[in-house]
From Swiss-Prot:
Forms a ternary complex composed of CCNE1, CDK2 and CDKN1B. Interacts directly with CCNE1; the interaction is inhibited by CDK2-dependent phosphorylation on Thr-187. Interacts with COPS5, subunit of the COP9 signalosome complex; the interaction leads to CDKN1B degradation. Interacts with NUP50; the interaction leads to nuclear import and degradation of phosphorylated CDKN1B. Interacts with CCND1 and SNX6. The modification Phosphothreonine is found at residues 157, 170, 187, 198. Keywords: Cell cycle, Cytoplasm, Endosome, Nucleus, Phosphoprotein, Protein kinase inhibitor, Tumor suppressor, Ubl conjugation. GO terms for molecular function: cyclin binding; cyclin-dependent protein kinase activating kinase regulator activity; cyclin-dependent protein serine/threonine kinase inhibitor activity; molecular adaptor activity; molecular function inhibitor activity; protein kinase binding; protein kinase inhibitor activity; protein phosphatase binding. Residues 51-91 are annotated as: Interaction with CDK2. The gene is CDKN1B. A motif (Nuclear localization signal) lies at residues 153-169. InterPro entries: CDI_dom, CDI_dom_sf. Its main location: nucleus. This is Cyclin-dependent kinase inhibitor 1B. It comes from Homo sapiens (Human).
């Protein structure tokens, strides 16, 4: 440290150490509007939620809390599940980070073992409305993580002769006496007509 030079414009190291000890720098995360009253915040949120619920109840004459229709301008009717479009009762999409298990294949992409069904996905599409939404999310997350570990995005090909999109061959390789030298087509190049710009 004896070779370190401090410029005249900067404060000396002793002064900086003393300043830091006397007045610690306040944290960057400051409360600009005073302390937060959590009870008041909770009351305001509950009041806002009640107001929204009452407004939607008046608008749609439906009690969303008890799942019952109310008297009003709309007439609610109970319908059979089969008469509804499929997107009303199909299972929800898995989260973006979750892996996808192919539905029509009975084995995984490497062909070694049967693919396990998705955690939380119902076995029968008819029973999707009966799925218990109170499953433990930590269990399903670990199950998905274990499931996704061995599955590849792109399946392994059995054909060992993979071909590049563009054949990167030079004229020397084409003029070789190799048996597959003429099998790759080459795009003819335009003769170079370059003009000088002045």
């Amino acid at each position: 440290m004896s070779n370190v030079r401090v410029s005249n414009g900067s404060p000396s190291l002793e002064r900086m150490d003393a300043r830091q000890a006397e007045h610690p720098k306040p944290s960057a995360c400051r409360n600009l509007f005073g302390p937060v009253d959590h009870e008041e915040l909770t009351r305001d949120l509950e009041k806002h939620c009640r107001d929204m619920e009452e407004a939607s109840q008046r608008k749609w004459n439906f009690d969303f809390q008890n799942h019952k229709p109310l008297e009003g301008k709309y007439e609610w009717q109970e319908v059979e599940k089969g008469s509804l479009p499929e997107f009303y009762y199909r299972p929800p999409r898995p989260p973006k980070g979750a892996c996808k298990v192919p539905a029509q294949e009975s084995q995984d992409v490497s062909g070694s073992r049967p693919a396990a069904p998705l955690i939380g996905a119902p076995a029968n599409s008819e029973d999707t409305h009966l799925v218990d939404p109170k499953t433990d999310p930590s269990d399903s997350q670990t199950g998905l993580a274990e499931q996704c570990a061995g599955i590849r995005k792109r399946p392994a090909t059995d054909d060992s002769s993979t071909q590049n999109k563009r054949a990167n061959r030079t004229e020397e390789n084409v003029s070789d006496g190799s048996p597959n030298a003429g099998s790759v087509e080459q795009t003819p190049k335009k003769p170079g007509l370059r003009r000088r710009q002045t």
